[in-house]
């Protein structure tokens, strides 16, 4: 299925220029959007298979990439394993960005009580592909602290590390999360009246 051995990789580089962590994107963007817009990331890349956490001076960072954002169990696993921050560098298309970018990032921050750092590609690219932009920083309560909007730019925000514990104390969803058996469709459907 995966024709090439390249990976879509995110790197964490320390202040001395050394690579301290690398994450290979797990979920490939193989989609058919409206008006014939279609993408097959698996034609160029093979998926990674391992979630990555790295200790930083400020807390634990969970690393992901782009389309991974649509798989909440990945982020729950990172948070349960100790992530305080989630890095999600992305190249969302304009249609998917307009519809889903802000809400998905805010949801991942809220449901896991984490800060979200989401640098985002913006602009027009080969074959008419357009990316949404809007690099964001979101706090654990879901408040957008910084939004680059459209265009080239850098976002920064002053963050309060106590916000992580506060959000998790007020809504302790990480503690309340319980394993469950995936449902099966009932053998006999209900009769319609």
Residue ranges of model-derived segments:
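Active-site catalytic loop in hydrolytic enzyme cores
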Residues: 4-81, 94-103, 170-173
């Amino acid at each position: 299925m995966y024709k090439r051995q390249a990976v879509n990789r995110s790197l964490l580089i320390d202040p001395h220029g050394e690579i301290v962590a690398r994450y290979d994107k797990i979920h490939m963007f193989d989609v058919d959007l409206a008006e014939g817009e279609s993408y097959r990331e698996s034609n160029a890349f093979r998926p990674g298979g391992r979630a990555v956490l790295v200790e930083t001076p400020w807390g634990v960072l969970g690393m992901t990439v782009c389309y991974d954002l649509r798989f909440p169990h990945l982020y729950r696993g990172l948070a349960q394993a100790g992530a305080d921050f989630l890095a999600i560098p992305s190249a969302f298309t304009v249609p998917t960005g307009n519809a889903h970018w802000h809400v998905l990032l805010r949801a991942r921050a809220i449901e896991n009580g984490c800060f979200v750092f989401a640098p985002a590609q913006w602009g027009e690219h080969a074959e008419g592909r357009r990316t949404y932009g809007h690099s964001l920083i979101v706090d654990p309560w879901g408040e957008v602290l910084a939004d680059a909007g459209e265009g080239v730019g850098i976002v920064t925000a002053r963050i309060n590390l106590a916000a992580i514990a506060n959000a998790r104390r007020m809504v302790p969803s990480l503690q309340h999360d319980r394993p469950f058996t995936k449902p099966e469709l009932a053998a006999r459907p209900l009769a319609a009246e």
